Amino acid sequence: RRLIRAPCGSVAAMQHGKDVLSAKPGMTTFAQLDEIKRVQKQTGRIYGVLYSEHFEVPAAVEAGNLIAAGAIGKVVNTIGMGPHSLRLNNRPDWFFTRNRYGGILCDIASHQFEQFLFFSGAMDGEVVSASVANRNNPHRPGLQDVGDAHVRTAETTGYVRVDWYTPEGLPTWGDGRLTILGTEGYIELRKYVDIDGKPGDNHLFLVDKKGVHYRDCSQVELPFGRQFLDDVRNRTETAMPQERCFNAMKMALTAQQMAEQGTEWAQ
């Protein structure tokens, strides 16, 4: 088994009868998305993207469990924040080339688009507005170091923001957060750090009519790997619906395209 990192590798693998789990973002253009969708439908193979800020974060998994149990009522809004550390000395040249990494919303915000759909209980959504910029790295003109987007479904709205501005003083690569608003309460995830608060990671705060509740989610089971292997064996879609997998990336690509209208990025 191998985690595939290139769209052409995903297509070739499916054409040779293999199921695929790709690193994010899976693809960087609509043409690649269309080709992967065509081959997936033609071959009947499973194509997945490892949206790790959901599938590999116990707090995000537990939030899904709580929402499924009705803990905050009906979800109406999400706010997903994905700050990252640039660490210039550890990045290859392609990282700063727009047509190779796909743009900041396509790349790291793909996590947030998937989570918006998942917590909304939706298979698809609409991008209302989006923006990208290079505010702090003029010597790297191909880099987009901040981006955001407003999104919605028929029942929910959301906001996504990603950046490469994590200060060196933070003891981890990013203060990733997610707030999920429901009709009967809300959940806040502090995924990787609770700044100047509780030690460790995977912090979940739940506010409902009974009060304020805290959960340390560090020991919550991560079911994605087990579910994905079950899907491979049984030809099911328990780990992630195929439609949602593709539509999260469609939203990311749509937001990227919308944000770049009228601009010209160094290639």
Positions of predicted regions on the chain:
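A short helix->loop->beta-strand "cap" motif at the edges of active sites that frequently abuts
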Residues: 16-18, 43-46, 156-157
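C-terminal helix-rich "cap/oligomerization" subdomain common to oxidoreductases
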Residues: 34, 229-267
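A contiguous active-site-proximal alpha/beta segment in oxidoreductase catalytic domains
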Residues: 4, 26-88
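Contiguous beta-strand/loop segments that form the cofactor/metal-binding neighborhood of enzyme cores
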Residues: 114-194, 224-235
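Active-site loop of classical SDR/Rossmann-like NAD(P)-dependent oxidoreductases
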Residues: 215-226
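Mid-domain beta-loop-alpha active-site segment that forms a flexible
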Residues: 50-58, 87-125, 142-145, 244-245
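Oxidoreductase and adenylate-handling cofactor-binding alpha/beta cores
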Residues: 56-80, 106-135, 147-157, 258
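Rossmann-fold NAD(P) dinucleotide-binding segment
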Residues: 5-23
